[in-house]
Amino acid sequence: MSQFVGFGVQVELKDGKLIQGKIAKATSKGLTLNDVQFGDGGKSQAFKVRASRLKDLKVLTVASQSGKRKQQRQQQQQNDYNQNRGEHIDWQDDDVSKIKQQEDFDFQRNLGMFNKKDVFAQLKQNDDILPENRLQGHNRKQTQLQQNNYQNDELVIPDAKKDSWNKISSRNEQSTHQSQPQQDAQDDLVLEDDEHEYDVDDIDDPKYLPITQSLNITHLIHSATNSPSINDKTKGTVINDKDQVLAKLGQMIISQSRSNSTSLPAANKQTTIRSKNTKQNIPMATPVQLLEMESITSEFFSINSAGLLENFAVNASFFLKQKLGGRARLRLQNSNPEPLVVILASDSNRSGAKALALGRHLCQTGHIRVITLFTCSQNELQDSMVKKQTDIYKKCGGKIVNSVSSLESAMETLNSPVEIVIDAMQGYDCTLSDLAGTSEVIESRIKSMISWCNKQRGSTKVWSLDIPNGFDAGSGMPDIFFSDRIEATGIICSGWPLIAINNLIANLPSLEDAVLIDIGIPQGAYSQRTSLRKFQNCDLFVTDGSLLLDL
C-alpha cells in the first residue's frame, strides 16, 4: 500500500470526528498521517488511526511524481537489503576445519605465473599514441637554449639610450641663429639709449641704484672687486675709490643688520637649526652676512668668487649624485637612459652661475643629462660670469633650451623622465620682481617656468638654491610684488642656512629637506667681523662637503 503515501486525505471516524492529513504510512492495521488538522481546529505533526475506527476516507490531493519515485527507490533498497539478509550467501556453509587443512596461498608462485614483461611489451606494441600527445608531454618543459643569468641589456627597453638627446643642441642653435639678427638690432637700440642715460660716475645716484637694498650691496661689491684693468698712473686713484666703496658697504651692512634685527617676524627669532645626523646646533645667517663673508674671503684671503663657486659646484654635485642612485646606478655600462636634471637659471652671477657650474659637474662625466632654461634668451645674457659658465657648461655636454615649449618638446623625445629640477632663478641677493623689472615678456616667461616646475609631480624633486622663487630671502615670507612661487621640496644652502628658513617651513608645506653645502670660506674669515664670530666655533665640514639639516 506504499502507492498511497503522500496522498492528502480526509478521514471520518466512527464517532463522527473529521481528520485531515497526508498519508505517511498505510498498512492493513491502520494509517499514519502527517500534518494533521482536526475538525475542532487542533493540529498535530503525526497521528495514527486504527482501521477499526475508520468509517470513511476521502482523497483530497494526489502525491507528486517525484515523491512516488523517491518512495519506489526506498522500497527497492529495502527489498535488496532484505534479500541480502536471506539464505543465498555461498560461503556461509563452508566447513572451517576443511579450510584450515588447506595449504597457505603462495603469492610468489602465482605472481610468477604472470609475465609482466611480455604483457607490457604487447601493450607498447599496440599503442599508437604519440608521446607529445600524452599528458606527460604537455607538462614537460620545452627544451631550449636558455642562459642561467640574464645579461645587463636583457629585460629592458631596447635601445633606451638611442633617443634625440644629441639633437637638442642643434635644434636650439638653429632657433637661436634665426632670432639673432632681430635681437642684435634690439640690443643696439638699447645700448644707444643706455649710453646716454647711464654713466659709471653715477654709481652713487639713487636714481640708478637697484630696487632692493640687497642689490645695492651686490652692486657695491662688484664695483669694488671687479674693477677693470688700469695703468700705473690711475692705480692710486682707483684704490682710493675702492676703499670708499668698501667703507660705504660696511656702513650699509651695519645699518641693514640693525634694521633686520628689529623688523624680523616673531617666528624668525630662532637663529639656529639642528643637523639631522650630528644633532649639532648650526647658526643661521642673513643675506647681508653671506655677502660679507664673500667680501672678506676675497679681500683678505684672495679667494675670489670663482673659487667659491667651484667649491660649491663640486660638493653639491656629489650630494645630488647620491640622490640619483650613486655608483650603483651612475655607470656607463648601465643600459638604461641617464637620469635627467633640469636647471631653471637667471642671468645672475650668484644663483645663475652656481647652477651652471653645478650642472657642468653633473653632466661632464656622461652619467647624467642636464638641460638648462634661462629667464631670458641665451643671446640676452649680460653677466660675464654667467656667460663664461655657460660656455664651459655647453662644452661639457650640457644642453640649453630657449623656452618652456622647447623644453616640453625635448622631454617628449627622451626616454629619461625629469628626476630633479634645480631652481636657481632668484637666489638670496634679489627677488623675482628685480629679475622681471618692467619687462612683461620676462615676467611672463618666469611665470611659465614656475608653472611648469610646479606641475612636476611624483618622484621629481625640486631643489632651490638658498631660497625658493617667490619668497623673500630676508624674512622667508611670500613676495608681495610677485604672486607666483615655486613649491620646492628641498633647499641647497650655500655656506650657511638663511634665517628665513624658519618662516619658510610654515609658508611652504611641500618643503621636505634642506642641505648645507661647503663653499670653501676659511675659518679665519669669521674673526674679521664681530657679527660673524658666532660662525667660528662650528665643526661642520670636517670630512664631507655637505650636511643635512633637520627641518
Swiss-Prot record:
The keyword Phosphoprotein applies. GO terms for biological process: cellular response to glucose starvation; deadenylation-independent decapping of nuclear-transcribed mRNA; P-body assembly; positive regulation of nuclear-transcribed mRNA catabolic process, deadenylation-dependent decay. Residues 93-129 form the DFDF domain. One of its GO terms (cellular component) is cytoplasm. The keyword Cytoplasm applies. Residues 64-92 are annotated as: Disordered. It holds the Pfam family FDF. SUPFAM superfamilies: YjeF N-terminal domain-like. It is found in: Cytoplasm, P-body. GO terms for molecular function: mRNA binding. Gene3D superfamilies: 2.30.30.100, YjeF N-terminal domain. Residues 288-527 form the YjeF N-terminal domain. It comes from the Eukaryota. The modification Phosphoserine is found at residues 257, 261. Residues 1-63 form the Sm domain. Keywords: Cytoplasm, Phosphoprotein. Homodimer. Interacts with DCP2. Present with 2340 molecules/cell in log phase SD medium. Stimulates decapping of both stable and unstable mRNA during mRNA decay. Does not affect nonsense-mediated mRNA decay. Required for normal P-body assembly. Belongs to the EDC3 family. This is Enhancer of mRNA-decapping protein 3.
